[in-house]
Amino acid sequence: MPQSYDIFFASSNVHKYEEAEKILSEFGIKLGFFKTGLTEIQEDSLSKIAEQKVMDAFNRCKNAVIVEDDGLFIDSLSGFPGPFSSYVFKTIGNNGILKLVGDDRDAQFRAVIAYCDSNKKPILFESNVFGKISKNLQGNGWGYDPIFVPENQTKTYAELAEKNKLSHRYKSLKKFANWFNNKQE
């Protein structure tokens, strides 16, 4: 018998899905994985990118779906890499970011969860986490986790066992889950 899901998570990034699935399961939401590459517009707004991606995802999936877009915004680099974080990570990686950051290491991670169903009206859930860029790679996480130290912490995301409770993604997914569960009542 096929598994039934409440909603799908559309992405080509299995790490994002696994993190989202674990978080949403705490709220009783069954999340399926719709593995797909989505059209991503070149835009400096995470919200606009997420909104476009979730419409693309719904048109492909034909089921209630969420997408996530996030970015690392570094103060001393005027918010760079921001919405271009994925591309920048693929090209220069964490070591490249560490070389670019000066004395001001303040940064924030922002996340947007976008939901769309048959109404075709995207609903967005946004959050951010302030912190600093570490001086070197710490831990074995994926993406920028080994260089981002959340505010009031001494370890990077990659080193924190409780990362899922502190992350920008967790905060956005929690907002979504509360809305989704109330919508179902």
Regions found by a protein language model. Give the residues of each.
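Anionic-ligand binding patches
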Residues: 2-8, 15-185
